[in-house]
From Swiss-Prot:
<dbReference type="InterPro" id="IPR018269">
    <property type="entry name" value="Ribosomal_uS13_CS"/>
</dbReference>
<keyword id="KW-0689">Ribosomal protein</keyword>
<comment type="function">
    <text>Located at the top of the head of the 30S subunit, it contacts several helices of the 16S rRNA. In the 70S ribosome it contacts the 23S rRNA (bridge B1a) and protein L5 of the 50S subunit (bridge B1b), connecting the 2 subunits; these bridges are implicated in subunit movement. Contacts the tRNAs in the A and P-sites.</text>
</comment>
<dbReference type="GO" id="GO:0005829">
    <property type="term" value="C:cytosol"/>
</dbReference>
<keyword id="KW-0699">rRNA-binding</keyword>
<comment type="subunit">
    <text>Part of the 30S ribosomal subunit. Forms a loose heterodimer with protein S19. Forms two bridges to the 50S subunit in the 70S ribosome.</text>
</comment>
<dbReference type="InterPro" id="IPR019980">
    <property type="entry name" value="Ribosomal_uS13_bac-type"/>
</dbReference>
<dbReference type="GO" id="GO:0015935">
    <property type="term" value="C:small ribosomal subunit"/>
</dbReference>
<dbReference type="InterPro" id="IPR001892">
    <property type="entry name" value="Ribosomal_uS13"/>
</dbReference>
<keyword id="KW-0820">tRNA-binding</keyword>
<protein>
    <recommendedName>
        <fullName>Small ribosomal subunit protein uS13</fullName>
    </recommendedName>
</protein>
<keyword id="KW-0687">Ribonucleoprotein</keyword>
<dbReference type="Pfam" id="PF00416">
    <property type="entry name" value="Ribosomal_S13"/>
</dbReference>
<keyword id="KW-0694">RNA-binding</keyword>
<dbReference type="GO" id="GO:0003735">
    <property type="term" value="F:structural constituent of ribosome"/>
</dbReference>
<dbReference type="InterPro" id="IPR027437">
    <property type="entry name" value="Rbsml_uS13_C"/>
</dbReference>
<dbReference type="GO" id="GO:0006412">
    <property type="term" value="P:translation"/>
</dbReference>
């Protein structure tokens, strides 16, 4: 397995597909990186030479924010929104959907498990 951006990418898959295993790289960016490195998109990772792998590593490290750096940036952005108490920050604090989704009937994933309401017991007749 080749190691790029501290991620083991699978050898038996095409380069474009393997690069998408790295957090922050999707299919479009992976294709763009292959074009910059002058590597065929149909080539498999195990067929790459050491020079091609080094070229891929250099391009990804110098031009793109991936893995730990990207995760850190996202969490800092969320923390900043929470600190300034903007609408999105408040939604994050309350653990509700942030981007305008309905919450009346859905949003169970974001809100967590349904909480039972303790109400009156029905009177026995």
């Amino acid at each position: 397995m080749a190691r790029i951006a501290s991620v083991n990418i699978p050898d038996n898959k095409r380069v474009v597909v393997s690069l998408t295993y790295i957090y922050g790289l999707g299919p479009t960016m992976a294709a763009e990186i292959c074009n910059k490195a002058k590597i065929s998109k149909d080539k498999k990772v195990k067929e790459l030479t050491d020079q091609e792998l080094i070229g891929l590593r250099n391009i990804i490290e110098s031009e793109y924010k991936v893995e730990g750096d990207l995760r850190r940036e996202v969490t800092l952005n969320i923390k900043k929104k929470k600190d300034i108490r903007c609408y999105q920050g408040l939604r994050h604090i309350r653990k509700l959907p942030v981007r305008g989704q309905n919450t009346h009937s859905n949003a169970r994933t974001r809100k967590g498990k349904a909480i039972a309401i303790a109400g009156k017991k029905k009177a026995v007749k």
